[in-house]
Regions:
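General beta-strand structural signal in soluble alpha/beta enzymes
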Residues: 33-34, 59-62, 83-86, 117, ...
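Short, ordered loop/turn segments at secondary-structure junctions
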Residues: 36-37, 62-65, 86-89, 146-148, ...
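Rossmann-like adenosine-cofactor binding region
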Residues: 162-238
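Glycine-rich phosphate/diphosphate-binding loop of Rossmann-like nucleotide-binding domains
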Residues: 2-27, 93-184, 188
Length: 259
């Protein structure tokens, strides 16, 4: 549950009902919320497999990494309907679209920029993957988790984090942000400070997408940089970068073409 963590199936029901409302409101998709009171990936896979034949598609919601990767990949193999984890792919698609637009405004080339991704959960990894597919070299993306920079040789990295490890001497966000062109935050409130923003490259792009409160507010950025493009995940600030502007329509398309 956003901002609260794993509180069980009943507590998550209002969130899932809200998701159903968004599917209907934005893409005219009739959906049924199903909450599974189990956090074992194999049990979740088995449950969805057994009910999947009665649905046109499955939208996975709020499953933590790395379980979400395991569950989605397995369900894609065994079901013949769309299986979509919007926390990963919806976020990645709309963030990459925002990045392309911001780079066009700033006249920067995607294969030359330096990106810092603060957060290493499902959405952060999906964004980094799509950035790479869109032309950002892997060596130009620094990913940071609770421990610090994900670098080659760091111990206790799982296979998903290891895929984003790079050769670097930077160990903290404060180190990595120096001369960065882009900051993508999918982490926690206050993670990016005004002093860090000052260290970024000319015409920086800042996507502070932590919910419910961003890593830094637009007002704080504007206090120290007049050349920054700033977006958040909130609808009450300009430039919203939130998977709501993507996932309903992606799922609508998948259903319409019977993918």
């Amino acid at each position: 549950i956003l901002g609260l963590g794993n509180l069980g199936s009943l507590a998550s029901k209002p969130v899932m009902e809200g998701k159903s409302v968004l599917f209907k409101r934005f893409a005219d998709i009739d959906s049924i919320d199903i909450e599974i009171n189990n956090d074992n990936p194999n049990s979740i896979i088995e449950t969805i497999k057994n009910i999947g034949g009665t649905f046109g598609g499955i939208n996975l919601e709020d499953i933590a990494a790395p379980d979400c990767f395991i569950i989605e990949e397995k369900l894609k193999q065994i079901l013949d309907i769309p299986v979509f984890h919007d926390d990963q792919h919806g976020t990645a698609i709309i963030t990459t679209a925002a990045l392309i637009n911001a780079l066009d405004i700033n006249k920067k080339k995607i294969d030359k920029i330096k990106i810092v991704v603060n957060g290493a959960g499902a959405s952060a990894m999906a964004c980094a993957n799509l950035f790479k597919k869109s032309g950002v070299p892997q060596k130009n993306i620094t990913m940071i988790d609770r421990t610090g920079v994900i670098f080659r040789g760091r111990e206790n990295l799982n296979q998903w984090k290891s895929a984003h490890a790079i050769e670097t001497k930077n160990r903290t966000l404060d180190d990595a942000i120096k001369n960065a062109d882009v900051f993508l935050g999918l982490s926690v409130k206050g993670a990016l400070t005004k002093n860090m923003v000052k260290k970024m490259a000319k015409n920086p792009i800042i996507f502070a997408c932590a919910n419910p409160d961003p890593e830094i507010t637009p007002e704080e950025v504007e206090e120290v940089r007049s050349d920054a493009i700033i977006a958040t995940g909130r609808s009450d600030y300009p430039n919203q970068v939130n998977n709501l502007i993507g996932f309903p329509y992606i799922f609508r398309g998948a259903l319409d073409v019977r993918s």
